[in-house]
Amino acid sequence: MKSMASEHSSIKERKCAGYVWRGMTLDESFYLRAVAIVMIMAHNYLHWMPGSPGENEFGFNADRVALMLEGLWQNPWDAPRLLASYFGHYGVQVFFFLSAYGLTKKYSAASPAWWSFQTKRWKAFYPAIILSALGYLIYEGFRVGWGEVWHDDVLNLLRQMVGVSNFIPANVYRPIGPWWFIGAILQFYLVLPFLWRVLQKYGDKVLYALLVGGWILQCVLGHIIYAQFDLNINHSILGHLGVCSMGIWFARRNEVTIPWWLLLLSVVMFIGGNFFYELWIPSRVVLLLFLLPLLRGVCGYLGKRRWCGAVLLLLGQLSVYLFLCNGYLRRPIVEWAKQESHWWTSTWTCIVFIMIVTAWALMMRTFERRIFLVLGRRPR
């Protein structure tokens, strides 16, 4: 009895000291993926609408937040479009965190060989990439013509698929804008086994060095490679070292108490990061300090509701296909919506767009599973 009372008292003290982060279940990670992918899809669609303020995703400009605030003041009903177009891209940071967190939980203790780890990741990732690429060629072939797609897109698409388009300025977003992420995540896979080995020897000091080093690279190297080569550091894993280090750090702990003062400070710093370049540099990391606890709370609540939990789980399980396919399925609906000036047009067409992408992703996953069954492989 005394032991139980002592344990209860200890838990209460930790909650008073701050937010208590505990390891995520698989369902929780799917819920977070679901929210993140909806943020990304809404952003990828709505930032094409006329009057969108832009976003501080790959570069900083304080005028963008000013435009968003001005739009909210002039037309509060347009808030979904303005907020999603400006903030929605942060869903990508949730994915970087979850990738670092999940892979570290799964593999770091075993210290897999470099080549073995790469082949496992390729086998897990490339079926979806290949099917989504074929889906793009078929979709665009019917939409604009096979000759045009073959002449303009095939080479650029192949470079995006293997992750080298990030080093070719004209190819980064062509033909599928969000596929810059493929190159960045493949780079992360390349260095992760080495990082785990170094961590075993030197511990968390490595993560702290990566966190600070990533910010220094952003400030110094980012300007140099942009000026000299027209390349953006945020199209590579170098621009996301802080978030990935954070994911690994949390994965190495079963429980973390984040002090309330640190959560409050992270909110203040993130707000400041929309106005000042110096605070924008660490804004992705400080955002996740309070966003992830918030999302876990919301998802935990919704997950207990039968239909909400089922929808979140489905979207989370489809998140790879949703990410890979949403970029090209924007057309032609986004072109039509851009011609309409009413705020509600962007909102309802965005909902329709997300539903279309979800149906397409379900179809892609069904094809993948059928192919795996024919080949005698276990479906994902």
Q: Where do the protein language model's features map onto the residues?
A:
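Transmembrane helix-loop junctions and nearby membrane-interface residues
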Residues: 44-51, 137-144, 164, 197, ...
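Long, hydrophobic alpha-helical transmembrane bundles and adjoining juxtamembrane helices/loops
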Residues: 178, 182-183, 222, 282-285
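Loop-centered beta-sheet repeat module
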Residues: 192-199, 204-249
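Alpha-helical transmembrane segments and terminal signal-anchor/GPI-anchor hydrophobic tails
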Residues: 227-353
